[in-house]
Amino acid sequence: MASKTELDNLFMNIAEQVAQMSKSRRSKVGAVVVKDGNIVSMGWNGTPPGFDNNCENEAPDGTLTTKACVIHAEANAILKLAAVSGGR
């Protein structure tokens, strides 16, 4: 049986991999929701469903700023969990 530390490290590694799903050019963030040692949801930072999945505005000088509509990875993971669990 894996120790709690080993499992925590595993879940962190998975979150880092999930982050690669983000379309953000500035900051890719991933999150996993774990219950009783099992992953029950995953999420990454990005725009809400129905929005163009472009996370940044680009200034003429090339500076990128995050759009206000971008949802944090942990919020996306919780929203996905709520959607599949019926909010329970």
Model features per residue range: what roles?
Residues 1-88:
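Zinc-dependent deaminase catalytic domain
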